[in-house]
Curated annotation (Swiss-Prot):
Belongs to the TRAFAC class translation factor GTPase superfamily. Classic translation factor GTPase family. EF-G/EF-2 subfamily. This is Elongation factor G, mitochondrial. SMART domains: EFG_C, EFG_IV. GO terms for cellular component: mitochondrion. Residues 102-388 form the tr-type G domain. Keywords: Elongation factor, GTP-binding, Mitochondrion, Nucleotide-binding, Protein biosynthesis, Transit peptide. It comes from Talaromyces marneffei (strain ATCC 18224 / CBS 334.59 / QM 7333). Coiled coil: none annotated. Its main location: mitochondrion. GTP binds at residues 111-118, 186-190, 240-243. HAMAP family: EF_G_EF_2_B. InterPro entries: EFG_II, EFG_III, EFG_III/V, EFG_IV, EFG_V-like, EFTu-like_2, G_TR_CS, P-loop_NTPase. The lineage of its organism: Eukaryota, Fungi, Dikarya, Ascomycota, Pezizomycotina. It comes from the Eukaryota.
Length: 803
């Protein structure tokens, strides 16, 4: 039965401008919209009885009502974003737009290094028809995986840059076929390239988190989990490598629950394991699923599941329903009533809980063995959101950065985010996620950061290092454009809106080294490469040390910097000399010290005069420095106080102890004096710097060193050797785990003690050990190390003065 509200919704629904009659899909969409809670369409003023027999008048009434509804939504999106639900936004999407956007999935594949991300992506591309044959990582067949387009990636067998592609997947179930469009990004697993994961997750609507069936949740899995939570990205999980010895998917699920603190349950159980892994049992439909064909491209479903698996499948289905009852109200009600939920109710609950970030369904298979990848793709369609189901906020610069909810409508003013830059043979390629409106070839767009207008000459869809030209891209899609000069994280609009979007989190570099070209004639290419790498990678920093007259590069680890040095040699033909890696030490103080500093230079003519009085003390945390003024009675004017703050900020950039940045220091100025003619902004800036340096050295200064969260995995027979290696480096061992044939050690290590660790680990474990390091926190350096660093700094200063 159609309620009156549904009739009104139906009559007010937007139609295609090229049609004057109602099409069946629009009828269905109208009823779909009206059934959503909080639908605004039911409130439209147009009624079914008001439509006359005139097609032209009918079209004008429909168009005006639709435009009015959209305008009302746009006003509410700006005025009250929290009060506007996604259901209301979805209910007002045009029928044709809904047909497109409801089948779009923007997803990323992320995991710990060597969990099989790129191998799984290769199968996804093959099964969706995007590539004609499968190639493996490490270039074992002289081709290499499609998504690893750089020679370095194929040689080393690791992903260095995130790679974007698109493909179409036809989901088949119970005789029905539905075509979905995936925008897919394969990300690196190594912690040194974590910025690639950050910027991918910033623009994606969902993700596939891959885990190893043997190792379960590993160190980088925890990092990826933290990144997904930072950007509120729903995820399904895929336990890979089910064909490996020691595979235990249920241990991995338990670790998701305990280590990641995210409710998880299997939606499949394996048929066999290790070298006898054959397929999976779908716990929702209770069917056995097998892969056949040379590369597992044929899916065979059987109603009869193996007899010995029935008790396991029934038990795991019960656990799935119980877990859902804890995170979904509808299933909880059914569970409490002791009723059995239908398959559709279970699937709907999984979808609701996954999108609400309360749950992750766990699939399982083996990418390398070509088994059970297709059911995971069905899971992407069933449980991950389309772009209209995700809340995306912008900041309105005209209203003091008030939050605004973006509407995924093609008819609205364009808003997009540039999330990745890449140099190609045709110039700079800028990856853009379109959040609102439509981006068209030849259109003018405005960079919100500098209000600069640029024309979009070409729009392409990327497939690794290949591209396909398109004329326009709608809301919710990802594309790349040429000829747009910008920085990573810039917001683009069509000029109608003064919106900006929050950028991605960029971690601070922890390691530096000096670099210079071996041949001076390569200086031009050297500078060009440095500028490009900085523009593409926000975690790669380049600076010039005026005292040592050296170019310094900084990054996330030894591998990170080594890759850029090697890329410079290959891509720019520049051989470089590098110095010893330098640790990014920090300086701080240990106690409060008061100061009263006078800068006075009066020798005829304009002089300098500035007096600053106050104190310095440790701030609440080692995160940032703080400057405060507590002047009463105007002893120092406002413009001079601004100069004092500038002097403080300059002083913290290079501490007086060993010349490194200062952390966790607070400076308060509460009194001072000025001179009628000799005081200036420069005087107060210099006086503040001098007062800072003097007070700093009197306040028990000490050096801080970066501690790295280190995880080492190796075969069990090498456990003693690995522990010995860590003890030699004064590591603090926090935890250890022993598996079937390997063990894992979790430790905090000083970065300074970890240089060269990889070669020692390889030697101690016959090349079978691996480790990852991630910055943890800064901690007070040992007294002997501080003494050595201070002496080294003072000697370097003395040598420069001699010159």
């Amino acid at each position: 039965m159609v309620r009156p509200a549904q009739v009104r919704a139906f009559s007010g629904l937007a139609r295609s401008a090229t049609s004057t009659r109602l099409i069946p899909s629009q009828c269905q969409n109208a009823l779909r919209c009206a059934s959503l809670p909080g639908s605004r369409l039911s409130a439209l003023p147009l009624r079914a009885t008001q439509i006359t027999s005139s097609p032209l008048r009918k079209w004008h009434q429909i168009r005006n009502a639709s435009a009015a509804a959209t305008a009302t939504l746009a006003e509410q999106a700006a005025a009250d974003p929290e009060g506007l639900s996604q259901e209301e936004i979805i209910s007002n999407i045009d029928a044709e737009e809904w047909k497109r956007i409801s089948k779009v999935r923007n997803i990323g594949i992320a995991a710990h290094i060597d969990s099989g991300k790129t191998t799984a992506t290769e199968r996804v591309l093959f099964y969706t028809g995007r590539i004609n044959s499968i190639h493996e990582v490490r270039g074992r067949d002289s081709v290499g995986a499609k998504m690893d387009s750089m020679d370095l990636e194929r040689e080393k067998g690791i992903t260095i840059q995130s790679a974007a592609t698109f493909c179409d997947w036809v989901k088949k179930e119970d005789g029905k076929e539905e075509k979905y469009h995936f925008n897919l990004i394969d990300t690196p697993g190594h912690i040194d390239f974590t910025i690639e994961v950050e910027r991918a997750l910033r623009v994606l609507d969902g993700a596939v988190m891959i885990l190893c069936a043997v190792s379960g949740v590993q160190s980088q899995t925890i990092t990826v989990d933290r990144q997904m939570k930072r950007y509120n990205v729903p995820r399904i999980s895929f336990v890979n490598k089910m064909d490996r010895m020691g595979a235990n998917p249920f241990k991995a699920i338990d670790q998701i629950n305990s280590k990641l603190r995210l409710p998880a349950a299997a939606v499949q159980v394996p048929i066999g394991a290790e070298d006898e892994f054959q397929g999976v049992v779908d716990l929702i439909r209770m069917k056995a699923i097998y892969n056949e064909g040379p590369r597992g491209e044929v899916i065979v479903e059987k109603d009869e599941i193996p007899e010995h698996l029935k008790p396991v499948a029934e038990e795991r289905r019960r656990i799935l329903i119980e877990t859902l009852a804890d995170v979904d109200d509808e299933i909880a009600e059914i569970f409490l009533d002791e009723r059995e939920p239908t398959n559709e109710q279970i699937k709907d609950a999984i979808r609701r809980a996954t999108i609400a970030l309360k749950f992750t369904p766990v699939f399982m298979g083996s990418a390398l063995a070509d088994k059970s990848i297709q059911p995971m793709l069905d899971g992407v369609c069933d449980y991950l959101p389309n772009p209209s189901e995700v809340t995306n906020l912008a900041l309105d610069q005209k209203r003091k950065e008030a939050q605004v909810k973006l509407l995924p409508y093609g008819s609205e003013p364009f808003v997009g985010l540039a999330f990745k830059l890449e140099e190609s043979n045709f110039g700079q390629l800028t990856y853009i996620r379109v959040y609102q409106g439509t981006l068209r070839k030849g259109a003018n767009v405005f960079n919100a950061r500098n209000d600069k207008k640029v024309k979009v000459p070409r729009i392409v869809r990327m497939h690794s290092n290949e591209m396909e030209e398109v004329q326009e891209i709608g809301a919710g899609e990802i594309c790349a454009v040429f000829g747009v000069d910008c920085a990573s994280g810039d917001t683009f609009t069509d000029g109608q809106l003064a919106y900006t979007m929050s950028s991605m989190f960029v971690p601070e570099p922890v390691i530096s080294l000096s670099i210079k070209p071996k041949n001076n004639k390569d200086s031009a290419n050297f500078s060009k490469a440095m500028a490009r790498f900085q523009r593409e990678d926000p975690t790669f920093r380049v600076s010039y040390d005026a005292e040592s007259e050296q170019t310094i590069i900084s990054g996330m680890g030894e591998l990170h910097l080594d890759i850029y040095v090697e890329r410079m040699r290959r891509e720019y033909k520049v051989d470089c000399e590098t110095g010893q890696p330098q640790v990014a030490y920090r300086e701080t103080i240990g106690r409060r010290v008061e100061f009263d500093h006078l800068l006075k230079k009066q020798s005829g003519g304009p002089g300098d005069y500035a007096r600053v009085v106050g104190w310095m003390e440790p701030s609440d945390s080692l995160e940032e420095n703080k400057f405060e003024e507590q002047i009463v009675g105007g002893a120092i004017s406002e413009k001079f106080l601004f100069a004092c703050e500038k002097g403080f900020n300059l002083a913290t950039e290079k501490g007086p102890l060993i010349g490194h940045k200062v952390l966790g220091t607070k400076m308060v100025i509460n009194d001072g004096a000025t001179h009628m003619t000799d005081s200036s902004e420069m005087s107060f800036k210099n006086a503040t710097q001098q007062a800072f340096r003097k007070a700093f050295m009197e306040s028990q200064p000490h050096v801080l060193e970066p501690l790295m969260k280190t995880v080492v995995t190796a075969p069990i027979e090498f456990q003693g050797d690995v522990i010995g290696l860590l003890n030699k480096r004064n590591a603090t061992i926090n935890d250890s785990e022993i598996g079937v044939d390997e063990f894992t050690v979790y430790a905090d290590c000083s970065l300074n003690g970890m240089f060269g660790f990889s070669s020692h680990l390889r030697a101690a474990t016959q090349g079978k050990g691996e480790y990852t390091m991630e910055f943890s926190h800064y901690e007070k350096a040992p007294g002997q190390l501080q003494k050595e660093l201070v002496q080294k700094y003072l000697k370097a200063q003395a040598d420069r003065h001699k010159k």
